[in-house]
A protein has these predicted regions:
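Bacterial N-terminal signal peptides
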Residues: 20-33
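N-terminal secretory signal peptides that target proteins for export/translocation
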Residues: 1-16
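Intrinsic disorder/low-structure terminal segments
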Residues: 13-15, 23, 38
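HIT superfamily nucleotide-processing domains
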Residues: 38-271
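Intrinsic structural disorder/low-complexity segments
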Residues: 7-10, 23, 158-160
Length: 271
């Protein structure tokens, strides 16, 4: 009941933020596009995973309609991989425990699994849909802020990276250090903070905790969007660029880091 009440409270706050942003934009003669926060069923992902994928996996070792279900540590530590209905190559990692999204304090709990390495490993499903191997820096992971999502179950988007985003990060890879620094350029029309993680760092340093401890003073991640993109650093070192951006609805920015991903996977056709 407490979790449901918290979700309802956040939905009310989201609507209020968006209403205020829209009023300011109208007063300024601007036009902004708000996310669809009135999605028909905001529990659709949770229902699919909890009521279908997990029972099928437990009873028949068949994760359908999900692509995969991992329950080695039990449902509180498990996750499912589901092909998203949008896009040719997009998949989602969805925890099998109830976690609403970026506003959940569970994200910082010491017993929460680090879902990001498993999401990265799921790039093989993206490659299968693309019908080719994809370079390390062609893949990205994203979680949208509480203001930009349509579902009230945490999910990590897994897909190809937008070609211009890949090119920009490659051109500035030497400027991205191991602490949070604001990028001096925009990605898809918005500014991000970035930091360098080595290949093992994604498992050793949970991005949720990295953002909460080093970037968000209050530890409140609700309006943050997080993106992880594969990167090639100096001397061929593989790693990741961790990106974080705070939603600012009064400026028409709802924290939709998923914009950095390309659900048509144009990179697969380019190389």
């Amino acid at each position: 009941m407490r979790e449901q009440g918290a979700q309802a409270d956040w939905r009310s706050r989201c609507r209020l933020w968006i209403m205020r942003a829209t009023m300011v934009a109208i007063a300024a003669g601007l036009s902004i596009a708000a996310p669809n926060i009135a999605f028909a069923d905001r529990n659709a992902l949770w229902t699919i995973v909890h009521d279908q994928c997990v029972p099928e996996q437990e009873s028949h070792q068949d994760p359908a309609p999900c692509t995969a279900v991992a329950l080695d540590g039990g449902q509180p530590r498990g996750y499912a991989i589901l092909k998203d209905r949008n896009g040719a190559t997009q998949f989602l990692l969805i925890p099998t425990r109830r976690i609403a999204g970026m506003e959940s304090p569970d994200l910082l709990a010491p017993d929460l699994p680090n879902y990001w390495p498993a999401a990265w490993d799921a790039k093989r499903f993206v490659e299968a849909r693309a019908k080719r191997a994809l370079a390390w820096d062609m893949i990205g992971l994203a979680i949208n802020s509480v203001l930009a999502r349509s579902q009230d179950q945490l999910h990590i988007h897994i897909d190809c990276v937008q070609p211009d985003v890949r090119a920009a990060l490659a051109a500035h890879s030497g400027d991205i250090g191991r602490t949070w620094t604001e990028l001096p350029f925009d990605l898809r029309g918005r500014r991000y903070f970035a930091m360098h993680l080595d290949a093992a760092g994604l498992a050793a340093q949970d991005p949720f905790k990295r953002a909460a401890s080093g970037l968000v003073a209050s530890g409140d991640l609700a309006r943050e969007t997080l993106v992880v993109i594969g990167a090639n650093f100096a001397e061929g070192e593989k790693g990741f660029v961790l990106l974080a951006g705070k939603a600012d609805p009064l400026k028409g920015d709802f924290g939709h880091g998923e914009d950095l991903l390309d659900h048509a996977c144009g990179l697969a056709a380019q190389e």
